[in-house]
């Protein structure tokens, strides 16, 4: 998906070495058995998709780590953090946080400036999402009947909590947004399609200008603005959380539709790194 890794990698009995830097590896079912403390590990990125609740992710702390970031929506975590939106609230008191989902990371940089400029009364989001490894390549059993169907053969409607999770990041929007997902037969890069009722009438030009100013200002690290006729493949390996497509904006009075692309792998991985740095450097 992202090409060859252009660094020198060597594999040993219990470690891999990248450009001379040794990284130990372990095979454990219980994170508490990994000797993070002995290794001097400050922060663990919990990316298994298994330990997404606070109590389970905190097993890494039992193993000696100081902080944990979950690469998924988390339950009962100290905070759900979308970098660029609410990461400034982090303090050293936060031990286990969620990086939210790739879709929430795309949606939040759209709704924040739009809500501040014209108010979002209510809205629905659809994410047209590349298939992932939680789906099947051919029809086979899965606890979710939709995800039991072949990812390469169908457009598959399924659920997402990405829109609802906006309320965890921006409390002023709690209960105002909902959404669903459609998994499609592409390997990477997804699309957020957001339709909302603004607090007043607006125009295509105003909506685009609000997001352009945000992309050039406070949200420049996570939001990009595009006025070229691009497609999903053009956004592969792009590090922004959200790539606003200004050519797709539609407005009818106070009813607004906007779209943004996101590399659901690479963009989200960059935000894991950003939030890791933000958490470790957070004030007391």
Where are these regions (language model features)?
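N-terminal Rossmann-like NAD(P) cofactor-binding subdomain of oxidoreductases
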Residues: 1-148, 250, 272-274, 283
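C-terminal substrate-binding/catalytic lobe of Rossmann-fold NAD(P)-dependent oxidoreductases
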Residues: 1-35, 119-122, 127-256
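Acidic active-site catalytic centers that drive phospho-/nucleotidyl reactions
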Residues: 42, 46, 193, 263
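Short, intrinsically disordered, mixed-charge
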Residues: 49, 62, 116, 168-171, ...
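A generic structural signal for alpha-helix starts
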Residues: 105, 202, 266-267
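NAD(P)-dependent Rossmann-like dehydrogenase/reductase catalytic/cofactor-binding core
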Residues: 239-284
